[in-house]
Design a protein with these regions (language model features):
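Extracellular/periplasmic solute-recognition and catalytic clefts
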Residues: 64, 360-368, 388-473
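Sec-exported extracytoplasmic/periplasmic mature domains
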Residues: 118, 130, 135-143, 313-315, ...
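N-terminal lobe/hinge region of extracytoplasmic solute-binding protein
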Residues: 61-113, 121, 135, 352
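A structural "hinge/loop" feature
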Residues: 63-86, 315-331, 466-473
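Gram-positive cell-envelope targeting signals
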Residues: 1-53, 57-63, 72, 406-408, ...
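Gly/Pro-rich hinge or "lid" segments in bacterial periplasmic/extracellular proteins
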Residues: 78-79, 266-296, 302-305, 309-396
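Aromatic- and charge-enriched surface segment that lines or borders ligand/interaction sites
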Residues: 98-272
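Beta->alpha turn/N-cap motifs
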Residues: 65-67, 133, 311-314, 410-416
């Protein structure tokens, strides 16, 4: 009996030794694997690449809404454009603390950058970067959506016209006269560079009325968005837009405006006089297109701080200064987005920014974004985002999420209008027919980690903040 007990005891000890050995080996293997992954990540970041790049697990298939194909850091036309730009760029308000105080009739704004902000080239963003962004938007040649050039910044008019005193007043008078009675060349320039981009954006706004219940009556009168667009924006009331394509209608209406943009200003709530003045300055004095000298009211205080002084205070000035996208390297020297180096496999290039992603490829109806490895993110993926263009209903988006075409789709504009259709589509009951809705965001819970989606961002339509914290399953 004692011998049998001893044999069992020896067998037990032997098993313990074997298990301990296996556990130690597996632990070393796991540790080695983890160390290798860590080294891989460190190496990849040091090379300016993502360690997970190229893997399907890190790729998000996204529908962001309809895209115009003409968006840049300075101009957008659709809600989808804005969402994509929020992934590529950050605004001054995201990167800096802006404080201000009144001074006489004007105000002084102090813009101080956060520490260690880098762009997608891996270069530090400094006060010189801010100067570059503000000066560029003050030039006579600038025709972007921003309105920095319309602010009463001290010394701005001298910078734009390149002269002071009596001659400055003479030039201002000459420009105003030319705008009132433009020649053919200036009129054509105003149509092409100012009226057409603005009208495209307004057309896309008109389209949103067709899924807005409060606008149903007027939309019923004009079954085609082009016709309603003409009703709202054509100065010639006899122009109906009937039988016209969007491009034809936009060009026709833009020609009706020329340099007389008062009706357009009433419709959009924006002042285009400064942009027209800039065109006239370029027309008469081409050497002043990029400004002359320094702007007295824009000063660099230190490596991270810029001071801007205005001679007249307006409540709208603060958001104008905060809401511009920061770019660190220009592609074409203007706001048109014409082709140059800097944006991978696309027909045009976008300026370098500080957003979470960079544009890697642009196809006919597709964008491919690659992670900016210099951007500090909460999540390790998605490392790539493939964005499909289109004008899809909410129900179509849900079906596309369910069948795997998209992992996530933005339906903020349509969520309320298509409420019944959305509810019906999501009640299919098939086990494979799976999707979830948070705010105006449809996603597949099997492919997207639900716990990493910010409810606040989903409720407010902030795609940038949704993506920055997102994890894929």
């Amino acid at each position: 009996m004692r011998i049998q007990y001893k044999n069992w005891f020896m067998l037990f000890v032997l098993l313990c030794v074997v298990v301990a050995g296996l556990y130690g080996i597996s632990g070393r293997l796991a540790g080695n694997r983890e160390g290798a992954e860590n080294r891989k990540e460190v190496w990849a970041v040091s090379k300016g690449k993502s360690a997970a790049a190229g893997g399907t697990r890190g790729t998000l298939k996204l529908y962001a809404g309809e895209l115009s194909g003409r968006a840049t850091a300075y101009h957008w036309e659709t809600a989808g454009d804005q969402r994509v730009l929020s992934l590529l760029y950050q605004k001054v308000g995201d990167l800096a603390e802006v404080t201000w105080q009144k001074k006489g009739k004007g105000a002084v704004y102090r813009i101080r950058l956060k520490k260690d902000v880098m762009d997608s080239d891996g270069k530090l963003v400094t006060a010189d970067t801010l100067l570059y962004n503000y000066y560029m938007r003050c030039q006579a040649s600038y025709q972007g959506d921003d309105e920095i050039d319309g602010m009463s910044i001290r010394g701005l008019r001298t910078y734009r016209y390149g002269i002071t005193g009596k001659k400055l007043r003479q030039r201002v008078k000459k420009v105003k006269q030319e705008i009132r009675k433009p020649d053919k060349k200036l009129r054509q320039q105003a149509v092409k560079e100012l009226a057409i981009p603005v009208l495209y954006r307004e057309y896309y706004w008109v389209k949103t009325l067709y899924y807005n219940k409060s606008a149903q009556k007027i939309c019923d009168r004009y079954p085609e968005p082009v016709q309603l667009f003409a009703y709202y924006y054509a100065p010639d009331t006899s122009y109906t837009g009937k039988g016209k394509t969007v491009k034809q209608a936009v060009q026709d209406i833009a020609k009706q405006y020329g340099t007389n943009l008062e009706h357009l200003a009433e419709m959009t709530g924006r002042d285009y006089e400064t942009k027209l003045q800039g065109m006239a300055i370029q027309y008469f004095w081409p050497d002043r297109a990029a400004g002359a000298g320094k702007i007295q009211g824009i000063q660099k205080l230190d490596d991270r701080t810029v001071r801007i002084e205005t001679t007249g205070y307006r409540e709208s000035d603060l958001p104008k200064l905060q809401n511009i996208y920061v770019v660190t390297r220009q592609c074409s020297g203007n706001a048109s987005g014409e082709k140059e180096s800097g944006a991978g496999k696309s027909g045009r290039s976008l300026p370098v920014g500080t957003g979470a992603y960079i544009l890697q490829e642009e196809g006919k109806n597709m964008l491919r974004l690659q992670v900016n490895s210099y951007y500090h993110r909460e999540a390790v993926n998605p490392t790539q985002i493939v964005i499909q263009n289109g004008d899809l209903t909410a129900s179509r988006c849900i079906r596309s999420v369910c069948d795997g075409t998209f992992d996530m789709a933005c339906i903020w504009e349509r969520a309320e209008y298509e409420k019944k259709e959305i509810s019906s589509t999501m009640k299919k009951g098939d086990a494979l027919w799976e999707s979830a809705l948070l705010g105006g965001l449809v996603y597949h819970p099997g492919r997207v980690n639900t716990t990493t989606i910010s409810k606040e961002a989903a409720d407010t339509g902030d795609l940038g903040n949704v993506i920055r914290g997102l994890e894929m399953n």
